[in-house]
A protein has these predicted regions:
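Cysteine-nucleophile amide-bond enzymes
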Residues: 1-222
């Protein structure tokens, strides 16, 4: 049964604001998330907590014939959704949109080629965050940008993200579940995080914010 999220009744108003800034193919949404990772751990919430950020999810925008689409990778899989529909069941309200500071003349088309290639592959969602044949949200954004030669950074080992006191707890839990179920946390693989303006993809010097929403007010950036 469909359960609308907090943005459902605001979606038309939000779309008006997004059209005001004229979204472009390649723009990236950063928003909060309650997605769960391996072991059922509320990975999105923990990442937001440990990185002191309200964002943990990332999605690339595609513009086709005036319509805005989200190329979203989540536990629902890899999907191309109209952004107005994508808002329907968000569990949170906060988001911002970032854009390349300096775009090359052919970047728009190159983004479209990279996005089409990614959609055609239709990769699975990476529930373990360390499957080389699957993707999670921020990883998909970095993959698409990487196709154009842009490195958004923001990749770290888990031990460099979580507090020192919490890391041993994760290691013990990971070892136990690896023995019992084969699932484990990616302790030896860097994961990509949205983070904040000091650490993470949001700190990339290649990008700039164009709009942000906190659930009540919009902020525009020049």
């Amino acid at each position: 049964m469909f359960k609308p999220g907090p943005l459902y009744n605001k979606r038309y108003h939000i779309m008006e604001r997004l059209r005001k800034v004229s979204l472009e193919t390649g723009d990236v949404f950063y928003n909060g998330s309650n997605v769960r990772g391996p072991l059922g751990i509320p990975f999105g919430g923990l990442i937001q907590l440990f990185t002191k950020s309200i964002y943990s999810h990332a999605t690339v925008t595609l513009v086709e014939e005036g319509e805005y689409y989200a190329i979203d990778v989540s536990d629902y899989g890899c999907r191309k959704l109209r952004i107005i529909d994508w808002f329907d069941n968000w569990g949170v309200e906060d988001f911002c949109v970032v854009r390349l500071k300096e775009k090359k003349t052919d970047d728009e088309e190159r983004f479209k080629v990279a996005i089409k290639k990614f959609l055609d592959e239709d990769p699975d969602y990476d529930f373990t965050f360390n499957n080389p044949d699957a993707y999670y949200c921020t990883e998909s954004v970095k993959r698409i940008y990487g196709e154009l030669g842009y490195d958004l950074g923001g990749s770290y080992l888990i031990k460099d993200i979580v507090p020192r006191w919490f890391y041993p707890i994760l290691q013990i839990g990971s070892l136990v579940t690896k023995i019992t179920s084969g699932a484990s946390l990616p302790t030896n693989v860097e994961i990509s995080i949205v983070g904040n303006e000091r650490k993470g993809m949001l700190a990339s010097p290649l990008m700039r914010k164009i709009i942000a929403y906190d659930g009540k007010e919009f902020t525009y950036f020049s």
